[in-house]
């Protein structure tokens, strides 16, 4: 394995606010992708009371080569999860919340109704909190993502993850063009929504392939793109091809803006929900000025 460069070293999680966030998450029986995916930014984010909640349990029905979330037979849905999530948001006084999930291919709707219930419960408690959802692809789940789009979260995020050439290796049970279709249809169903997608670099893709993904996302009218370094969670996961330099990330940011994205987050430690509240405010401001 390549030795990790200095620009990828994050502070160890600690501090009073970090512990308060942890306790609130545990008290309300919630899972977070921050913990399950071993995110390097957990210390920084939780010390700002920012946590990305992972609904539909902690066990995924897929086994993507990049992801650290456990794979297996999932538990039954928790009927109290939406209410518990809303209570935690109120306790943490969140202005912006990101909700993601494991893949639930075992459910007839892929878990779409649980996303909708979470949106509804949050809106019952507060109209001040903006809601960003990061969903799986709902492959072969007719009407699933369409129903969520109609429920009107503020941001609909679905990650493209990597370039199409690497899908068979990195994301074998997903389909690149289905993900593009999802993003395009979400915008058509609810044009008021901001749409967002992200990809990892350092897996063996070329710059030209990344530029093509940018073009594909813009063709789907995606507003916001995130680009971050892939980090190998364990030796059994996909290997890192190389570490992309901060200068290259800046170049990707420049190119993405030139292609028409309203907001671009591109850095080694960028993740889908990293600085999500600040980026949402930038997104809203950029939309207003266009």
Swiss-Prot record:
GO terms for cellular component: cytoplasm. [4Fe-4S] cluster 1 binds at residues 34, 39, 45, 273. Belongs to the radical SAM superfamily. Lipoyl synthase family. Signal peptide: none annotated. Binds 2 [4Fe-4S] clusters per subunit. One cluster is coordinated with 3 cysteines and an exchangeable S-adenosyl-L-methionine. SUPFAM superfamilies: Radical SAM enzymes (SSF102114). Pfam families: LIAS_N, Radical_SAM. It catalyses: [[Fe-S] cluster scaffold protein carrying a second [4Fe-4S](2+) cluster] + N(6)-octanoyl-L-lysyl-[protein] + 2 oxidized [2Fe-2S]-[ferredoxin] + 2 S-adenosyl-L-methionine + 4 H(+) = [[Fe-S] cluster scaffold protein] + N(6)-[(R)-dihydrolipoyl]-L-lysyl-[protein] + 4 Fe(3+) + 2 hydrogen sulfide + 2 5'-deoxyadenosine + 2 L-methionine + 2 reduced [2Fe-2S]-[ferredoxin]. Residues 46-262 form the Radical SAM core domain. InterPro entries: Aldolase_TIM, Elp3/MiaA/NifB-like_rSAM, LIAS_N, Lipoyl_synth, rSAM. It comes from the Bacteria. The keyword Iron applies. This is Lipoyl synthase. CDD domains: Radical_SAM (cd01335). One of its GO terms (molecular function) is metal ion binding. Its EC number is 2.8.1.8. [4Fe-4S] cluster 2 binds at residues 60, 64, 67. Pathway: Protein modification; protein lipoylation via endogenous pathway; protein N(6)-(lipoyl)lysine from octanoyl-[acyl-carrier-protein]: step 2/2. Its cofactor is [4Fe-4S] cluster. Its main location: cytoplasm. It is found in: Cytoplasm. Keywords: 4Fe-4S, Cytoplasm, Iron, Iron-sulfur, Metal-binding, S-adenosyl-L-methionine, Transferase.
């Amino acid at each position: 394995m390549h030795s990790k460069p200095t620009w990828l070293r994050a502070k160890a999680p600690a501090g009073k606010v970090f512990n308060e966030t942890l306790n609130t998450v545990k008290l309300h029986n919630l899972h977070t992708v921050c913990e399950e995916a071993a995110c390097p930014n957990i210390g920084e984010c939780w010390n700002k009371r920012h946590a990305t909640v992972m609904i539909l349990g902690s066990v995924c029905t897929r086994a993507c080569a990049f992801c650290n979330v456990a794979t297996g037979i999932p538990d039954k849905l928790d009927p109290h999860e939406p209410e518990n999530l809303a209570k935690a948001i109120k306790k943490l006084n969140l202005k912006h919340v990101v909700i993601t999930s494991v893949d639930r291919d075992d459910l007839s709707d892929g878990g779409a109704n649980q996303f909708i219930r979470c949106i509804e419960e949050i809106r019952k408690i507060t109209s001040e909190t903006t809601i960003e959802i990061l969903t799986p692809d709902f492959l072969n789940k007719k009407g699933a993502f369409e129903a969520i789009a109609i429920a009107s979260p503020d941001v609909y995020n679905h990650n493209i993850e990597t370039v199409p050439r690497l899908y068979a290796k990195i994301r074998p049970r997903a389909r690149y063009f289905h993900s593009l279709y999802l993003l395009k249809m979400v915008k058509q169903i609810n044009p008021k929504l901001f749409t967002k997608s992200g990809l990892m670099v350092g897996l063996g893709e070329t710059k030209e392939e990344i530029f093509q993904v940018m073009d594909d996302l813009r063709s789907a009218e995606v507003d916001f793109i995130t680009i971050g370094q892939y980090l190998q969670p364990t030796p059994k996961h996909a290997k890192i091809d190389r570490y992309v330099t901060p200068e290259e990330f800046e170049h990707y940011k420049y190119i993405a803006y030139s292609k028409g994205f309203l907001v671009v987050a591109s850095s080694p430690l960028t993740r889908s929900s990293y600085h999500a509240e600040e980026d949402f405010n930038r997104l809203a401001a950029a939309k207003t000025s266009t």
